[in-house]
Amino acid sequence: MLHICYKCRLSKRKLVYTPDTEGAGLVDINLQLPVPISLVDTVNSHGWVNLAPWNWDSDQLELSRPECIDGRTIFTVTVNQSTLTNIDIRIAGQAVDDLLTDRVLCLVKRWISMDWNPSDAINIARKMDVRVAQLIADGGGRFLRSSTFYEDLVKTICTVNTNWNSTKRMVKLLVEEIGNGAFPTPLMIADCGEAALRQRCKLGFRSPVLMNATTELLSEHVISDSGDLRPGGISYQELLSIRGVGPYSASHVAMLEHDFSHIPVDSEVSKYCEEKYLLKPDQVAGFFESWGDYRFLGYKLSRILDQRNWIGG
């Protein structure tokens, strides 16, 4: 058994590689966090955890999913948490090496928004609602993100003008039919064609929207072949410029990129705000305007604290 210790500015990780006779192995990593981050709160923040290929064991409080990295065989990545300042990661698969573990670390950091600095949000919340400030300081206020920007975009497109069960079915079929058990890359989507998205994945009118977005983002080098966003990010206005992406989708994807200045208002959000605040849909953004760049956090975290559920949660 090989024990290797790595150190970096924000984290320490201990890797243990245990091969078996068939070349499979396990790598265990302990990732130390720069600030408290609650895995449970992040998982329960919105409905993403209910979409393939995520798996959440609510008894063991373990989050896992299959990943296909750089065209290799599929690996399973599992995370759990013993304290708010560390995450335990396990990688299971064949030929696990340092390059793979480095990539998995990047994925897990993205899932839990480890690199997001909550200081400004906490400062605003202290003026607006001290409960929200405390929630963020205690490790809440993060929203489960997919392994890539592209996956978050695709899943958001699958929520448009449909019900939650239909969204879950579409995403499940994308994983099974196109991704061979993992979430498909942009190249896999582009290669499968619009007809496959309609017939095999039941995406309906979303099929040309997804094909157009995929080819546009790839050709303009906004995303990599694996779906990672270019350095520098993407703005709300740039998201709106993608044909077929409207204000709701742009707001939701921007939120997952830590732009909390817009509230993705759909029928479910509209219903909640009408019941809670007597607001019409076009009044929601203005009602939370005093939160400035953190409008969405003002809305969503207040709602979480009121013990109301996000759609699909």
Predicted regions and their residues:
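HhH-family (HhH-GPD) DNA N-glycosylase catalytic core used in base-excision repair
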Residues: L2-G313
